[in-house]
């Protein structure tokens, strides 16, 4: 039996759900770029080089969009760009994304991950 996700009272198959999640991450990067262009600040404390890369390329290498509220547990948030935060991935000196999942990507997340304190809130 194929898995379906109830998203805002509409049922999506796994492929549709994956596309929805990816779309939210892409939109979050666009929003982040606009925010940095307008204010000079971002949703995280980007280095000057990272800001330049974001403005030039629309994203920052080594970072990925993380759904703060688990898309699997809270499917209504899967397509919400405001549910995305940018975390260092495993190719960096730290793996904030894995840390947000408490060491196992199968562990759901439920909130903002504070990399400094290494805690979800």
Predicted stretch roles:
Residues 1-64, 69-121:
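Nuclease and nuclease-like effector domains acting on nucleic acids or nucleotide cofactors
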């Amino acid at each position: 039996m194929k898995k379906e996700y109830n998203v805002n009272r509409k049922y999506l198959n796994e492929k549709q759900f994956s596309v929805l999640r990816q779309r939210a991450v892409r939109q979050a990067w666009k929003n982040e770029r606009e925010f940095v262009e307008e204010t000079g600040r971002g949703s995280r404390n980007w280095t000057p080089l990272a800001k330049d890369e974001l403005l030039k390329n629309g994203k920052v290498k080594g970072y990925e969009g993380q759904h703060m509220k688990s898309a699997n547990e809270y499917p209504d948030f899967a397509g919400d760009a405001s549910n995305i935060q940018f975390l260092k991935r495993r190719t960096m000196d730290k793996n904030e994304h894995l840390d947000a999942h408490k060491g196992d990507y199968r562990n759901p997340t439920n909130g903002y991950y504070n990399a400094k304190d290494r805690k979800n809130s």
